[in-house]
Amino acid sequence: MRAGNDLGSGRIGVLVGRIALPSMLAQFISVLYSIVDRIFIGQIPGEGALALAGAGVCGPVVTMVGSVAFLVGVGGAPLLSIKRGEGDDDAARGILANCFLMLCVFSVALPAAILPFREPMLRLFGASDATYSYAEAYFTLYLLGTPFALLASGLNQFIVCQGFAADGMKSVVLGAVLNIVLDPVFIFAFGLGVRGAAIATVLSQLASCVYAVRFLLGKKPPIRITRGGYSAAVMRRVLTLGFSPFIIIALDNVMIIAMNAVLQHYGGAARGDALVTCATIAQSFMLVVTMPLGGITGGTQSILSYNYGAYRTERVRQAQKYIFGLGLAFTAVMTLAARLAGPLFVRLFTTDEALAAQAFDTIKVCTLALLPLGLQYEVVDGFTALGLAKLALPLSLWRKAVYFAAVFALPAFFGADAVFYAEPISDVLGPLASVAVYCVCIRCEYSCRMRKPEREG
């Protein structure tokens, strides 16, 4: 793919499709890392349900690693694209060098800081006495593979932002296919159970990591990994812009923890573990929605950033129209899929009739408001692509605040099952605020951007 010139001169509709679709597919495939693990874990004879609940408790760990990768990757990639749009490739190289260093440091510091506290953390995440051993086994091994996961996910942003969406997809596909192959081998053939699932995931992430590093050291991308030029100011700018997606994903952690804790509290000994298992299955389906949706809106950030940096705001406007359309079309399809294919999806995780019926009901509730969620993603990711974290962050925090309020309020009045309605409530009230702010602010931002080169001239 011709990265540099196409971002500034290719037909917008074709360009959006060429970058959005591979990015969406890559994110869909990346979901397989967690979903395939859960599918195979749920089929372990005699202990599938408890093992699945234990692995679900580890969801915040996976999310935590992803949030740190986004802190650097999503913080640095738009800045790199903007600098390329301005024609300043030296500054773009400096941004990538600083981001690579930060990813390396975080990949060592994160597991070192967390591992000593794994037992209280897992208890906080919602592990019961019955599920703790499964959660601890998966948690420990997955965390030891953090360097591979961080580098693979973080560096992939810098592959996609240079226009190489297909190559970014290859990195993800490599790891996902390897995970599908290795999971049954380690879980069943070697008899390692939950530990086998974690080992398969770590090895798969290692493969993706090696691919991403080799690509960014090779001759194909115009901006490659280099040494030197490290700057605290550059790192600060990256972390400032990346803080919005980081805090949002980190809050997803807290959301999972809060939901599991509330379900255990209101479900009690009789229903707590079953409700957590239902939540794990529903969260897996929501990943099938939100990860590809994020691929559409996040992958196309390079188009917005590059043209914004080149002062071509009309191309930015056109691109956003296509991105909004793609997001709405995707969420409409997934709303139908939740109702038509939901029972089949649930059966991948459990053969228990009662649990399957309850999990399907949970999925239907959680997907009631997917359409407005598509608008939320594009508004927030669009503001991030333009370097406007001051707008992106409050809008994201507002949606999370609505979610938290509903998680704690609903079950107090309507029982444990009502907690699942927190998702559609936040998916309506969040986008309403985001669209309102977008309509008010975006035209002013474009006008200010176009006046800047006139003043410089």
Which sequence ranges carry the predicted segments?
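Short alpha-helical transmembrane segments in multi-pass integral membrane proteins
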Residues: 1-22, 80-147, 189-243, 304-369, ...
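N-terminal transmembrane alpha-helices
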Residues: 7-39, 43-47, 60-75, 79, ...
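Residue-level signal for transmembrane alpha-helical positions in Major Facilitator Superfamily
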Residues: 17, 32-33, 72, 113-117, ...
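Transmembrane helical elements of multi-pass membrane transporters/channels
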Residues: 18-37, 141, 175, 204-208, ...
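Helix-terminus/linker motif at the lipid-water interface of multi-pass membrane proteins
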Residues: 28, 32-53, 122-129, 185-191, ...
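Alpha-helical transmembrane segments of multipass membrane proteins
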Residues: 35-39, 112, 120, 154-158, ...
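Small-residue-rich hydrophobic transmembrane alpha-helices
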Residues: 52-112, 149-168, 276-336, 340-342, ...
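Short runs within selected transmembrane alpha-helices of multi-pass transporters and secretion channels
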Residues: 142-160, 171-176, 197-212, 293-297, ...
